[in-house]
Amino acid sequence: MSGKRYPEEFKTEAVKQVVDLGYSVASVATRLDITTHSLYAWIKKYGPDSSTNKEQSDAQAEIRRLQKELKRVTDERDILKKAAVDSICQCNTPFNYLFRCFELQCLSRSVV
């Protein structure tokens, strides 16, 4: 004879009553008409130390790490953007540099 099959939602709710609300395993098992052995097994499987919670915390740690890296890279990009503009608010491109040199040469020739 096999035991009853309970849905996942029922199991997680039973575990929440013990873990989150602080009820005793015996009282929850009696109220829900299940064995304490089953409830202990569910707590082990769905409780706060279960592998799904560890995976979620690992994923959250990865998200935090990626957010820090994104901020660092964004800050570096912003610094480089600011460095690309010289003191007279013109882009430091080779064309602008050559144009200014040519302009200075033309001005110096006209003065002489």
Curated annotation (Swiss-Prot):
Gene3D superfamilies: Homeodomain-like. It comes from the Bacteria. One of its GO terms (biological process) is DNA transposition. InterPro entries: Homeodomain-like_sf, RD_transcriptional_regulator, Transposase_8. It holds the Pfam family HTH_Tnp_1. GO terms for molecular function: DNA binding; transposase activity. Belongs to the transposase 8 family. This is Putative transposase YkgN. The lineage of its organism: Bacteria, Pseudomonadati, Pseudomonadota, Gammaproteobacteria, Enterobacterales. The gene is ykgN.
